[in-house]
Regions:
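Amphipathic alpha-helical segments at domain termini/boundaries
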Residues: 11-32, 177-209, 219-228, 256-272
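Charged catalytic carboxylate motif
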Residues: 43-47, 96, 103, 202, ...
């Protein structure tokens, strides 16, 4: 189905905790610390960030998929590493994680989270930064930081409320309770819930569908939706019209609209 799953090599260093493979134009990043339920250590965060950055720069990757090995997507932060840190150290650690999540959110390419198991704390924060979330029936999601005497540190309080609303976000965060996949879908936290064995096939099918369309239009759409988060509707509508108009100088606009007028059934975009 895909190129052989491999560890990622950056600057001569093998990163064993991150696996990367390409399936046509889909990049698949697999978190691979199953012995710790893929807990986020500082080194692991850096490995993920480097791999995401490389996938973003790869012109052959149109859509990025994130998933985990074993029982966990990401089960949270590595508490053993985090426990002895002081304020300056933990601020630096959380800054690394925040940079990763900001990159996922702002990168032009769509990012899909295939939540295969536990997505807790920092793991849910990673998933929240993705554009689309599919979950297995066995997945558990939550932000349990209050149970440890702390709060989210890489965007959880900011993104969860935007996705599920303030009241539900506050209940989840104030109680630290984990919810199951069906509840996550009910509140709009995930798009779809599937049996474990159907999760990746469904995610790849979705990614393949996105890959079929003009990527300039896909990326312009993501920019406009992201812009709406921080601007009023007048500013957002102007920004949308600007991106819409810019696409009328592209080959893809001529190919897409021309193909529609000619009633072509299989339009091949060139992404330029």
């Amino acid at each position: 189905m895909a190129e052989n799953c491999r560890t990622v090599q950056q600057k001569g260093k093998i990163m064993k905790n991150v696996l990367f493979e390409k399936h046509n134009h889909i990049g698949i990043i697999t978190f691979n610390r199953p012995e710790s339920l893929n807990a986020l250590s500082s080194g692991f965060v850096q490995e993920i960030h480097d791999t995401v950055k490389a996938a973003e720069a790869d012109d052959e990757v149109y859509v990025l998929v994130l998933t985990g090995t074993g029982k966990s997507f990401i089960a949270g932060a590595d508490i053993e590493e985090m426990y002895p840190m002081g304020p300056e150290e933990i601020f630096e650690f959380s800054s690394y994680a925040t940079e990763l999540n900001m990159r996922l959110e702002k990168m032009p390419k769509p990012v899909i989270a295939a939540i295969n198991g536990y997505a807790l704390g920092g793991g849910l924060e990673v998933a929240l930064a993705c554009d689309i979330r599919y979950a297995s029936e066995t997945a558990k999601m939550g932000l349990p930081e209050v149970k440890l005497g702390v709060i989210c540190g890489s965007g959880g309080t900011q993104r969860l409320c935007r996705i599920v609303g303030d009241s539900i976000a506050k209940e989840m965060i104030f109680t630290g309770r984990a919810i199951d996949a069906q509840e996550a879908m009910r509140i709009g936290l995930v798009n779809k819930v599937l049996p474990q064995e159907e999760l990746m096939p469904a995610v790849l099918e979705l990614a393949e569908e996105i890959c079929r369309y003009g990527q300039l239009a896909i990326r312009a759409s993501k920019k406009c939706i992201n812009f709406a988060q921080d601007h009023d509707i007048e500013e957002g509508s102007l920004y949308e019209r600007q991106r819409f108009s810019e696409l009328f100088v592209t080959e893809d606009q001529k190919i897409g609209m021309g193909g529609f007028l000619r009633k072509e059934k299989d339009i091949k975009f060139k992404n330029r």
